A protein has these predicted regions:
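Short, acidic/polar
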Residues: 28-40, 84-90, 165-175, 226
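Conserved anion-binding
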Residues: 12-14, 18, 98-186, 190-191
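Glycine-rich, proline-tolerant flexible connector loops at the mouths of alpha/beta enzymes
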Residues: 46-64, 104, 185-196
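Catalytic cores of alpha/beta
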Residues: 77-78, 83-96, 100, 201-238
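Alpha-helix-loop-beta-strand connector modules within alpha/beta enzyme cores
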Residues: 58-80, 115-130, 195-216, 220-221, ...
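C-terminal helical cap(s) of enzyme catalytic domains, especially alpha/beta-barrels
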Residues: 113-120, 230-240, 244-267
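Conserved, mostly hydrophobic/aromatic
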Residues: 11, 39, 47, 79, ...
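Structural preference for beta-strand elements that scaffold enzyme active sites
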Residues: 5-9, 46, 74-78, 99-101, ...
Length: 267
C-alpha cells in the first residue's frame, strides 16, 4: 500500500506567503522558498503553492518563483492559481514545477486537462475541486446531483469559491478522471477554515468512485482530524495550511503519531 502523504499548502500573494507564520530560525519569514525548504527538512512529502492573487486579479503566474523553488527544495511541489491555458501550465512545468493544479480553467475549458496529460503525462496534472453543500431545491440542480441525506448535494464552485456552477462533485470528479487528470484535490468549502475536521464521508465516497489519488483539503484542526480523513475517509493525502504555519502541529510529531496508530507514512 502506498504511503499516505502530508502536504503543507502555501498561499502566495505578491511573492509572499500570506497566512501567518510563527516559526523561529527562518531567515526570511514568509518567503515561499524559505518556507518550502523548512517544510522539506521537517519531512513534508510534497508542497502545494497557490498564487491566490492570480485568479481574481488576472496576474500572470509566478514563473520566476517556481524556478527558485525548484532550485532549492528536493521534494515534489505543485503550483496553481490563475492557470487558464495550456501555455500557462507548460510555462510552470518547464520552470521546474513537478505538477500543476487547475480549477476554474478545468470547468470552462476541460480540454486543457487532456492536452496537458497528453503532452506531459497524467501524473503532472492535478484538478482542484472546490465544492459546498447546497440544499436541494434552492438552486437549479444538476441532473446528476446525488443528494446527501435526501436534502442536499455537493455543488462545484469556481473563481476561488465565489461562483457556483451546474456541476456536482462526484460526477465532475469522474469526468476529470476520464479526461486524464492524475490526481484530484478536493476542498470542502463547508469545512475550510473551521478546524473542525474534514468532510470525511465525501472523501470516502470519492475513494469508492475513483481510481486516482485524492488529496483532502479543508478543515484540519488536529492530528485526529488528519488521521480520520486518511483512514475513515481513505484519502491518499492530507493537505493543511494554518495548523502547520502557526506551529500548532509539527510534521515530525504528526507523522510519528500516525505511524504509531498504524497509518503508513514516510518518516
Amino acid at each position: 500500500m502506498l504511503a499516505k502523504r502530508i502536504i503543507p499548502c502555501l498561499d502566495v500573494k505578491n511573492g509572499q506567503v500570506v497566512k501567518g507564520i510563527n516559526f523561529e530560525g527562518l531567515r526570511e519569514v514568509g518567503d515561499p522558498v524559505e518556507m518550502g525548504a523548512f517544510y522539506s527538512e521537517q519531512g513534508a512529502d510534497e508542497l502545494v503553492y497557490l498564487d491566490i492573487s492570480a485568479s481574481s486579479e488576472g496576474r500572470r503566474t509566478f514563473t520566476d518563483l517556481v524556478s527558485r523553488i525548484a532550485e532549492r527544495i528536493d521534494i515534489p511541489f505543485t503550483v496553481g492559481g490563475g492557470i487558464s491555458s495550456f501555455e500557462d501550465a507548460a510555462r510552470l512545468l518547464d520552470a521546474g514545477a513537478d505538477k500543476i493544479t487547475i480549477n476554474t480553467a478545468a470547468v470552462f475549458h476541460p480540454e486543457i486537462i487532456s492536452k496537458i496529460a497528453s503532452r506531459y503525462g497524467s501524473q503532472f496534472v492535478v484538478v482542484a475541486i472546490d465544492a459546498r453543500t447546497v440544499a436541494s431545491g434552492t438552486v437549479a440542480e444538476p441532473v446528476e446531483a446525488t443528494s446527501l441525506n435526501g436534502n442536499a448535494y455537493w455543488q462545484v464552485m469556481t473563481h476561488g469559491g465565489k461562483r457556483p456552477t451546474d456541476k456536482e462533485l462526484y460526477s465532475w470528479a469522474k469526468q476529470v478522471q476520464n479526461l486524464g487528470t492524475g490526481e484530484i484535490l478536493f476542498t470542502s468549502m463547508d469545512n475550510d477554515g473551521t478546524k473542525n475536521g474534514y468532510a470525511v464521508e465525501a472523501y470516502s465516497r470519492l475513494a469508492d468512485e475513483l481510481s486516482i489519488p485524492v488529496i483532502a483539503s479543508g478543515g484540519a484542526g488536529s492530528v485526529g482530524d488528519i488521521e480520520e480523513v486518511l483512514t475513515k475517509g481513505r484519502a491518499d493525502a492530507a493537505l493543511a495550511a494554518s495548523i502547520f504555519h502557526y506551529g500548532e502541529i509539527s510534521i515530525p510529531d504528526l507523522k510519528r503519531t500516525l505511524r504509531s496508530h498504524g497509518v503508513n507514512v514516510r518518516i
